[in-house]
Structures are given as C-alpha cells and as structure tokens.
Swiss-Prot record:
It comes from Bdellovibrio bacteriovorus (strain ATCC 15356 / DSM 50701 / NCIMB 9529 / HD100). Transmembrane segments: none annotated. The keyword rRNA-binding applies. Pfam families: Ribosomal_L9_C (PF03948), Ribosomal_L9_N (PF01281). This is Large ribosomal subunit protein bL9. NCBIfam families: L9.
Length: 147
C-alpha cells in the first residue's frame, strides 16, 4: 500500500515521502498515529506539486548563495586590535567577529559557514574560506592591524 508520510518514521522514511508499506502496518500503526495518509490520486498530485515547488525554492536559494559568494570572493576584512610588543593579539579574531564585520559590509554570512585555517592570534594577513556546500566557496582575506 502506498502512503505519504506526514511525520518522520524510523526505518520507513521522512516527512512528505511517498513510500510503499504493508497494508497492516499502514492501517494498524501509521494511520491511527497520524504518521501517514493513504496515497490517493489527489494526494499524489498534491505531493508531486509540493516536490516541484520545494525543488524550485532550493535552486533559487543555491543561486542566491552562489551570487553572494561571487560578491565576497577576494574581499578583505580589516580589524584594528590591541596587540603586545611581539605582535600577539590581546584576544582572538573569531568567525563570529568576521561574520559581524561582513554584516556591516552588507553581506549576511553565518559564522558556521566561515572556516579558518587556524585561530587568528597575531597581527598580519590571514585567509578564511566561506563555504556553503561542496564546491560553493569564496576565499576572503583577514587583515589584522594594530589599533
């Protein structure tokens, strides 16, 4: 029997998936718990329409992210911070700091998408990568100067 899952069901599938299960499992477990609905012709058409809409949204979001990455690729983010005599910072430049600075520049980047080779603890030029998905990344420069 074909059903459309309304909630995630372990070892069966995820929300919105069209799956084939035994009739007894559907009638005795899935339907009473409102975990699935029978896949009637109307529901299948609705399911397919929702899948197309979701796919279009996903493509649009990926295109927008790629455009944003193209804008920030090669950008230099400058920090003016206090440092000791040996050019060691009194603190660290974190991904949160970089995200906030990019926000000031008009680019909305989540801190979890920014990857540093190593923590920034000294003055100078450093590199960071903004990575959304495999193959979708932009390289930015981090300049740390004495305040």
């Amino acid at each position: 029997m074909k059903v459309i899952l309304q909630k995630d069901v372990k070892d069966v599938g995820r929300v919105g998936e069209l799956v084939n299960v035994s009739e007894g499992f559907a009638r005795n477990f899935l339907f009473p718990r409102k975990l699935a609905a029978e896949a009637t012709e109307k529901r299948v058409k609705e399911y397919e329409h929702l899948q197309r809409v979701a796919e279009a949204k996903k493509k649009k979001a990926l295109a927008e992210r790629q455009e944003l990455l193209n804008k920030i690729n090669g950008t230099t983010v400058t920090f003016k911070l206090a440092a000791g005599d040996t050019d060691k910072l009194f603190g660290t430049v974190t991904t949160t700091d970089i995200s906030k600075e990019l926000q000031k520049m008009g680019h909305s980047i989540d801190r979890r998408d920014i990857h540093l080779e190593e923590p920034i603890k000294v003055l100078g030029q450093h590199k960071a990568v903004v990575r959304y998905a495999e193959g979708m990344e932009a390289k930015i420069q981090i300049a740390v100067e004495r305040a």
